């Protein structure tokens, strides 16, 4: 629901601990609803003078109540206007994010709970990437991204760095990683960043060859389409897309639009110069 029109504001929930509220009723600052009428996210808003994390416990209690009432656990947000934290407590620890997610981005996160598969068990397509060191690199990525807790599949680290020599098949390896993440339902949309248009074009061509079933665009030449699965871009082009707005004033890409960013040649200078991209998008890196 839109925060602007007041939908979801001060939503009453039942089942709060009596120690918190003798009546057992609580009032959630905001609930963001899915089209099926189930809660996608709960937002606990704190005053700017108060730390955002001060809302974590309260937001968790509200999520418990909403889950009991509607049969779906919402994504948890708490914010003071300066800092915003997201917590999908069924899978990941809390993390700071740029802002709130759009409805389709939240729905994707909730749906993923039921259909996400263990990356460590994935059989890599050796037609894409079959050299022993490539397979080991892919396996290490899987082991880094996945963590098990009490026999349950959970998310591990969200960032990986592969150090590979020129000619060792970096693009093939990254294509195989994308194949793994998409087929295991960890990623739907992927952003590939390079510092030159020629590298962007080469990468798109290679991914089209190895993953022809995934739609792809070169953002330096083609008009963006939000439904595209693979987006290839230079850093400045993507910076402009983040800073600019569509005709209706909304940004082209929400903070949760991409599930994975691949950086070609991840130098420290690149990260420092274009860190706004990585701070804006909440995704695997």
Predicted feature locations:
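Short, hydrophobic beta-strand segments that form beta-sheet elements in well-ordered domains
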Residues: 76-77, 215-218, 261-264
């Amino acid at each position: 629901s839109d925060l602007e029109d007041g939908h979801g504001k001060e939503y009453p929930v039942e089942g709060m601990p009596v120690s918190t509220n003798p009546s057992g009723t609580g009032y959630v600052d905001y609930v963001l609803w899915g089209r099926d009428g189930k809660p996608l996210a709960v937002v606990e808003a704190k005053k700017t003078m108060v730390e955002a994390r001060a809302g974590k416990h309260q937001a968790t209690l509200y999520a418990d109540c909403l889950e009991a009432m509607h049969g779906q656990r919402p994504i948890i947000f708490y914010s003071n206007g300066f800092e915003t934290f997201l917590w999908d407590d069924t899978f990941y620890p809390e993390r700071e994010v740029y802002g709130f997610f759009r409805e389709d981005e939240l729905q994707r996160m909730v749906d993923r709970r039921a259909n996400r598969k263990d990356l460590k068990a994935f059989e890599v397509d050796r037609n894409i990437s079959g050299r022993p060191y490539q397979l080991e690199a892919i396996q290490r990525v899987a082991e880094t991204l996945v963590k098990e807790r009490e026999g349950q599949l959970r998310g591990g680290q969200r960032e990986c760095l592969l150090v590979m020599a020129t000619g060792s098949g970096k693009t093939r390896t990254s294509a195989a990683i994308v194949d793994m993440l998409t087929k295991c339902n960890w990623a739907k949309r992927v952003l590939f960043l390079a510092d030159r248009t020629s590298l962007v074009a080469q990468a798109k061509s290679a991914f089209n060859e190895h993953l022809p079933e995934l739609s792809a665009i070169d953002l330096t030449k083609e008009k963006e389409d939000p439904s595209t699965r693979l987006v290839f871009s230079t850093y400045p082009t993507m910076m402009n897309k983040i800073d600019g707005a569509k005709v209706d004033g909304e940004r082209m890409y929400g903070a949760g639009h991409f599930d994975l960013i691949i950086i070609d040649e991840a130098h420290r200078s690149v990260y420092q110069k274009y860190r706004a991209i990585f701070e804006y998008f909440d995704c695997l890196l």
